[in-house]
Curated annotation (Swiss-Prot):
InterPro entries assigned to the protein according to its UniProt record, in alphabetical order: Globin, Globin-like_OT, Globin-like_sf, Globin/Proto, Mb-like_M
Family: Belongs to the globin family.
Domain Globin: 10-150
Keyword presence, Iron: yes
Record key words, sorted: Heme, Iron, Metal-binding, Oxygen transport, Transport
Oligomer status and interactors: Heterotetramer of two alpha chains and two beta chains.
This protein's name: Globin-2 A chain
Binding locations of heme b: H102
Length: 150
């Protein structure tokens, strides 16, 4: 199942190009991107806050050092994923390692999928006129790799 999701992403030049192009914009400020993504998650899917109680008051945003740390760690994981697009076995490995942390917190593939819409909104905000549905679809496909690992 993970292998199929990896093959879909790594086997598509269009998906890889959209991920790389958009990551070029998102990674210009890793911390701000991560915090925006988390804020969008909590705004669009307030039910997901229950997975993050260990972080304290997530409404404090950047002032919450635990949330800030999570946001930075998350975006470095995304960076790892994008860096691994030309090596399917490497992408599979880094995604499976990432998945372990979520499995330990009892986050299912379906629950993890809640990040797709917040990611779309983050992409729109950060990319402006460069945003497209194809870019959002590429990120949804990458999220699908994580979901398959969960």
């Amino acid at each position: 199942m993970v292998a199929d999701a990896v093959a879909k992403v790594c086997g598509s030049e269009a998906i890889k190009a959209n991920l790389r192009r958009s990551w070029g914009v998102l990674s210009a400020d890793i911390e701000a991107t991560g915090l925006m993504l988390m804020s969008n998650l909590f705004t669009l899917r307030p039910d997901t806050k229950t997975y993050f109680t260990r972080l304290g008051d997530v409404q404090k945003g950047k002032a919450n050092s635990k949330l800030r740390g999570h946001a930075i760690t998350l975006t470095y994981a995304l960076n790892n994923f994008v860096d691994s697009l030309d090596d399917p076995s490497r992408l599979k490995c880094v995604v499976e390692k990432f998945a372990v942390n979520h499995i330990n917190r009892k986050i299912s593939g379906d629950a993890f999928g809640a990040i797709v819409e917040p990611m779309k909104e983050t992409l729109k905000a950060r990319m402006g006129n460069y945003y497209s549905d194809d870019v959002a679809g590429a990120w949804a496909a990458l999220v699908g790799v994580v979901q398959a690992a969960l």
